[in-house]
């Protein structure tokens, strides 16, 4: 689920809201999502981080509006109407958007451009290095060309 966020412009630049929280600390855009950890990640040019999925954890990603990352999703939930379907799209690239990733949806990202790209993500489970809640899938499970720029 892609969620459009507020972005404001003036003569001095721009301002993007990353997340609003209610009085109980819950995300206004996803009140049932309880943030347990917030993480910053930088992707260098040419990097692909894919694919993995979580059994319990859900993610909300935010790519800085003036950066851009190619996002890939693959629905591995057998009870889902979109089971075995995949999609790819760009986050950032001048837009303020958040991406909600439910548990069971494999996700990955690639920086196929020339500059580093930054993202902040919120998760509803704290990372446990001794018992990580994730399953790794091959980066090319959807084909090597999945992560290449399509011309057109």
Question: How would you describe each model-predicted region?
Answer:
Residues 1-94, 112-152:
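Non-catalytic, conserved peripheral segments adjacent to functional cores
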Residues 92, 99-100:
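Structured catalytic/translocation cores of nucleotide/phosphate-coupled proteins
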Residues 99, 107-113:
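Short beta-strand His + acidic residue motifs that chelate non-heme Fe in jelly-roll/DSBH
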């Amino acid at each position: 689920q892609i969620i459009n966020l507020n972005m404001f412009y003036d003569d001095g630049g721009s301002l993007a809201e990353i997340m609003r929280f209610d009085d109980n600390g819950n995300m206004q855009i996803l009140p049932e999502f309880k943030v347990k950890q917030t993480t910053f990640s930088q992707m260098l040019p040419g990097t692909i981080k894919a694919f993995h999925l979580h059994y319990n954890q859900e993610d909300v990603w935010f790519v800085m509006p003036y950066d851009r990352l190619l996002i890939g999703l693959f629905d591995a939930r057998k009870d889902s109407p979109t089971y075995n379907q995949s999609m790819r799209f760009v986050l950032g690239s001048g837009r303020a958007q958040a991406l909600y990733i439910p548990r069971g949806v494999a996700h990955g990202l690639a920086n196929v451009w020339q500059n580093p790209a930054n993202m902040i993500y919120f998760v509803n489970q704290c990372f446990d290095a001794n018992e990580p809640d994730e399953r790794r899938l091959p980066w090319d499970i959807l084909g090597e060309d999945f992560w290449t720029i399509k011309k057109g």
